[in-house]
Amino acid sequence: MKYHHGNLKEELISSACKICEANGHAHMSLRSIAKEANVSQTAPYRHFKTKEDLLAEVSKKGFEKLGEILNQASCQNDNMTAKERFIEMGFAYVKFGLERRNTYDLMHSPIIDKVEFPELLEAASAAFDELIKIIAELNPGISDTDLSRQCIRHWAQVHGLVDLVGDAKI
């Protein structure tokens, strides 16, 4: 067991991400995370007051990764049309949700009150902003209201597809 750790907080978050993805957030505990990080059972409490604090960090990392993946999909090829990049973003979103199903479920779980975690809310918003940018590019001059409606509609479609395919309903 390690008693001195370079960046304990990041190591704990990394361990929590691994456990979440392997077993789901319901099977995570601060004790299991400490064991995965090879630190004392009390070490996580130095950085996280509650399990929810740590879950919020795991969720934030998931949204950051999703935003990065969506950005890459929308910028992957300058020769692609906006519509083609939009379609690639949809595929990337579904792939992320299916390949990282446990993290994805946590990201969209009501177990974490995003309002209580501004950095998590910011990461989630940044990922959604990737969709806003491409929809706005596809629809020059679109009103804010219509842009919002289209974004929610398209997000609901890919989100629903992840849930249906992930739950083997289709």
Sequence positions of predicted segments:
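Hydrophobic alpha-helical connector segments
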Residues: 57, 71-99, 141-142, 150-154
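Hydrophobic alpha-helical segments that form the core
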Residues: 132, 144-167
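N-terminal intrinsically disordered/low-complexity leader segments
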Residues: 1-7
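Amphipathic alpha-helical packing segments from all-alpha helical-bundle domains
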Residues: 71, 108, 115-141, 148-152
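Helix-turn-helix
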Residues: 11, 15, 22-53
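Amphipathic alpha-helical segments used for helix-helix packing
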Residues: 98-115, 163-170
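Generic hydrophobic, amphipathic alpha-helix propensity
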Residues: 8-17, 33, 58-66, 70
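Alpha-helical DNA-contacting segments of helix-turn-helix folds
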Residues: 20, 55-62, 70, 107, ...
